[in-house]
Every structure is written in structure tokens, then in C-alpha cells.
Amino acid sequence: MRLVLLFSCVLAVSSYAEIILAHSDENLLSRTKNNLSKWNENRLYDYGSKSTMSLPVSSLFPALQTLWIGVVADCSYVTHFTSRMEAKKHIFQEFEGVSTLYEDSFNINVQIHSLILPSAHDCSANVVDRPEISMSPRISIEEKLEIFSKWKYESPGNNVFEAISPHERESFPSEPQVSVLFTSSVKRSPHGVSWFATICSETHIENEWHVGPLSVVSAYPNDRLVVAHEIGHILGLIHDCNKKSCGDHSEACCPLSSSLCDAQELYIMNPSNSYTYANLRFSDCSILQLHSLVEKKYVSLSCLSKPSEKSVLRLGTCGNGIVEDGEECDCGEDCENNPCCDGKTCKLTKGSLCDDQQDACCYQCHFKNAGTLCRQSTNPCDKPEFCTGISSKCPVDENWDDGRICQDSLGMGSCASGVCTSASRQCKKLTNFSSLSCHSDSCKVSCQNEDGTCFISAKDYIDGTRCRGGLCYNGVCVPIEGSSASWSKQPSLFCASGTMLISLAVIAWFFW
């Protein structure tokens, strides 16, 4: 198939979050978004061109090349996982997916060059001298990009990125070509931010920004799609066209074909942040665009390297630091300091029962004594866990039973799904003014306003929240046998107001 597409690489300033850049300095943060996007606007005009092409896609990128990625996961990101091992395995799986997408479209093999993954100690210490891992989830993703970029700029030559497999280090480039920070954000939707068309450039200062081939992604568990999208921007790819850009011509974009504008949200470079696994390829326009940018020398891929099977690390290989089927241990990059694990065979050394680096109930290659604390309680409704003495694994994390009386900094409450809460607390959290619950027979969030009016929403209380004579589950009050005596000692959850008006309407603004 031969494709003839007309596209423009001149992109007007978009409101889309990816190309709005922020700065950690308060004075710069006070500027308008239009001013903050000035760097990207100029950058995009620098790469402006119109290109008409008629080439078979298979001939555009004939030689397989490798793009090496330096990955950092901060403390807010690793909280999604029960262990560093689990986080590492997830990151490897996501990048295998990213590599498949790029190999299919651009003949580019994407590999992890290095990985910085903080330990529980790193995160509990909250070390301020490690900004790359200690950023708050409440900091905007744009601020995180500037902080991450500044850290990378100030760190070259300090070996901040260590090759993930030391015994293969000579086959790795000294530095990754792209750096990605995995983080978490208070925003719920997946999103990312990156510096446009910076591939094969060093991190540098330009117009007050620390600019380079870097990206920040907050998209768990959909990391691979957002990472693929952001790397696309670093390579110089613009967004696919959608109804908005086709209708108001607010920005240049990649059309579906020479005759149809709207790409219908089908591809990786879709500007929306609602990614799905339907977006599993790049559009033909994106493929042709990258080829044109390289051919016309608007971007260079000269830093990419020829693939070497010896240096490629994947899941299912001894030495990647992840214990997988057929392995007893995997010391990864720290085998010299690990007497429990044979790094060449991924088997435990003679006399070893376990690996200290791998399991919480292992000490000096043997099981810790029964009763040794291996996981601290994180809140009044979370049980502490203790080693059994017959296993190196810390028992599964468990919560105290729902309905158990608890106390925290907010006062008395009861346990529900592992948190100390109450119906009144949930009212206070969901409304701007109400701290009183009402209608205790209901397991729908029911809150009383100042004049005594009780509103019932369609939102359920957290599973395990107390209701009259029972506990709430899936919006229903489930009776508990013999509960009357124990419950009678607790304050009534019923709102005794002079006038009780039950509103069955869902008032969205009231709760959100």
C-alpha cells in the first residue's frame, strides 16, 4: 500500500496539558499558561514544514535501532505496589509493550537502560536531597517535569543512571537517550508531559527552562500507552486530528487520510487523555511524519544504537532483578553484595534458605524468628504483620474487621475497608459544609445541612461503614447477629432534627 498524506509540523499553541510547561520557581509559576508554553511554541515553529510523501511504510525505517530509556519511579508511584519487585516487574512489562508499539511502526526497539526505584527506607526518610523521588503527588505534573529536568541537568557525570546489568555494562551507552519519571498525581485521569522534539539532545538551559529528552508520566496502570505517546512527542510527533482540531483549526494535526481529517481517537497520538487498549498503534500519518522529520533533518536519530541481543534485558531472563518462574532468586545489579544468591544461575547459594534482598522475613540467608515484625501498621485499621519462622515471606497484608472501634487524629470512628472512618466523616469529606450524617438506616451517603434538611445521594458509603444494626456493603445495610447489645453503647447515628426532609434527588454540586 502506498500512502499520500499532507501534514503540517507547525503546531499552534494548544491548551492540551502536555505542551503547557511549568516551573518550580514561584515567580515563573505565576505567569499565564500562554507565557509558559512559549518555549514549546517556538520549538514547534522551528520544526515547521509541509511534506507530501508517497512511500510504502515498510521502506521508511529499514534498519532496526534501539532507543535506551532511563526510568525513575518516585515514592508516590511505588505506593501502587506491595514490593519493589512487583513495581519493577510492572515497569518491565509496560516497556515491553511500548517496544512492541515502536517496533511495529518505526522499527525502533525500546529498552530500559537503567532504573531508579526507591526503597521503603528511601521514601520513609523523605530525603530532600533526592528530588527525583520525593516529589509530592499534589505538585502539578508540569512542575515535576521542570524539577526532573533540573535534576537530570545537574547530575550528568555523577552516574545517576547506573546500567541495570553491570556485567553487560560495556555494551550499554553511557547515558540513556530518553529519561522517564513515573509518578502519581491527585488527578485521576492518565496524563503525561514532555519536551517536544528533543531526541538526541543533551539536557540544557533554554529560556529559563531545563530542556531535554525527558518526560513525566502519571498513568498507572495504563503506563505503556501514555509513555508511547510522550516518547512520540520527544521524537517530534504532533497529535492526531480530532473533531475539535478539524473543526476550528486550532492546531495542526495528523489527519486520518488525505481525504478524511478526524482520526477518530484510534491511535497513540490521540490528544485525549482517555487512553484505551484500542489505541495500540501509530497512525500512518505519524509514521510518515517521523520519516519526513528525519529525512529533512528537523530531528536526528543519530544517538540511537544498533540492537545487541547480549545487552537487551527482558522479562524471563536471569539477571533482570525479578524473580520469575524457574528462579529461586535474582540479585540483578547487586550480586557482588549478595551472599544468598548466585547471580549467574539465579539459584540460592549453598546453605541459603532465602534471599535478604528479596523477602522481608529473611536475614543472613535464613528465615527470621517467628514474631518478628515485617510490616508495620499504616493506620488504626491496618494490622501489623509478623514473620512465621517457617517462611521468608511476610504474611499477606490484612485489615482489622469492619466495625471495629478505632481512633486517629480526627477522633473516634470505626474500621471500614481498612480505614478509620464514620458516616459523618464521609459527609464532611464529600461536602463543603456538612459534618453530620443522617438517615442511619440508609447506606447511601446522607448528610444534613444547617437547617436540618437531610440529603441522600446515589453514592454509597465505604463498604464496612456502620449503619443501624449492621454494616454497609454495596449500598445495603447488612444486619449483624447479636449486634444490638454492642451497638447500643455507641452514639446514635440518626440525625434528630426538628424537621427532617429526605431529598431523593442527587444533587451533584452538593457532593462534588
From Swiss-Prot:
Keyword vocabulary terms for this entry: Disulfide bond, Endoplasmic reticulum, Glycoprotein, Hydrolase, Meiosis, Metal-binding, Metalloprotease, Protease, Signal, Sporulation, Zinc
Glycosylated residue positions: N35, N432
Active site: E230
Location(s), subcellular: Endoplasmic reticulum; Spore wall
Effect of E230A: No effect on sporulation
Any one GO biological process: proteolysis
Secretion signal span: 1-15
Entry GO CC: ascospore wall; endoplasmic reticulum; endoplasmic reticulum membrane
PROSITE patterns referenced in this protein's UniProt entry, alphabetically: ADAM_MEPRO, DISINTEGRIN_2, ZINC_PROTEASE
Binding locations of Zn(2+): H229, H233, H239
InterPro entries listed in its UniProt record: Disintegrin_dom, Disintegrin_dom_sf, MetalloPept_cat_dom_sf, Peptidase_M12B
Disulphide linkage map: C246-C254, C374-C394
Location, primary (coarse class): endoplasmic reticulum
Described function: Has a role in the development of the spore envelope.
Descriptive protein name: Zinc metalloprotease mde10
Organism encoding this protein: Schizosaccharomyces pombe (strain 972 / ATCC 24843) (Fission yeast)
